[in-house]
Structure formats: C-alpha cells, structure tokens
C-alpha cells in the first residue's frame, strides 16, 4: 500500500546551497523532516545548476519520510540571466530595462516546457514573452 502524504512543502532554494538556516530549516522543521538529510540530497541533486534558483516540492509522509521533486528555474530568473540584469523594471509599462531576442525566449521556453501548462512550443514562448513584458523587457526579433 502507498504511503499517505501528510504535508506538501514548496520552496525556492538556490541550487546546491540548501542549508538548515532560515528559510529552509524552519519550513522543514515544522513538517518534521530530517533537515540535514534533505539539504544533503538537494545539494547533491542540484550541484550542476549552480547560480539558479530551483523550486522544489517536498512530499512529507505520515512516517516522516519524504521525497522531493525539483522543477525548472522560474521564467523570471532565466529571463534576467539572458538579459544580463539584476532585476526587472519597477514600472514595466513605462520604463524598459532590457531586451531579449525571440531566440532567447525560445531557448527559455524549451527549458521550461516540462513545467509549463502549454500544448506546444509556440504557446510556451507566448507565456515567456508575457513574463518578459511584465518585467519591463522588450522582446526583439
């Protein structure tokens, strides 16, 4: 019989840099997870994606065991990296802070495809373009 899920914890942690310090420690401690076990396993699994923020969904079972699924980095993080900026615009409709090409948008959409609710690459690209526009980026050909 399958184990019963008691709790689901969602976090965004820098790849390879999970530590028992806040915010990771308290969130896992409340769920009753072995914090050191999680941090070691997460860091080992994400070591190749250094510098990225990785969303993780942790399923906690009744016997306090856990497993977790790592997702692709958020579109905003990938767009900022592609454009070479630290943050988006405070006024996206007035102030444009950077531009990304359609080729960069396509590359990001291909990376994000497993986590996006999109039927094909074209609709995934439109989602990423919308995120870029809401951050104050222009999308150029």
Swiss-Prot record:
Gene field: rplK
Official protein name in the record: Large ribosomal subunit protein uL11
Lineage: Bacteria, Bacillati, Bacillota, Bacilli, Lactobacillales
Alphabetical GO biological process terms: translation
Record bears the keyword RNA-binding: yes
Modification after translation, per record: One or more lysine residues are methylated.
Function: Forms part of the ribosomal stalk which helps the ribosome interact with GTP-bound translation factors.
Source organism of the structure: Streptococcus mutans serotype c (strain ATCC 700610 / UA159)
GO CC terms, sorted: cytosolic large ribosomal subunit
Quaternary data: Part of the ribosomal stalk of the 50S ribosomal subunit. Interacts with L10 and the large rRNA to form the base of the stalk. L10 forms an elongated spine to which L12 dimers bind in a sequential fashion forming a multimeric L10(L12)X complex.
Protein family (similarity comment): Belongs to the universal ribosomal protein uL11 family.
Keywords for the protein's UniProt record, in alphabetical order: Methylation, Ribonucleoprotein, Ribosomal protein, RNA-binding, rRNA-binding
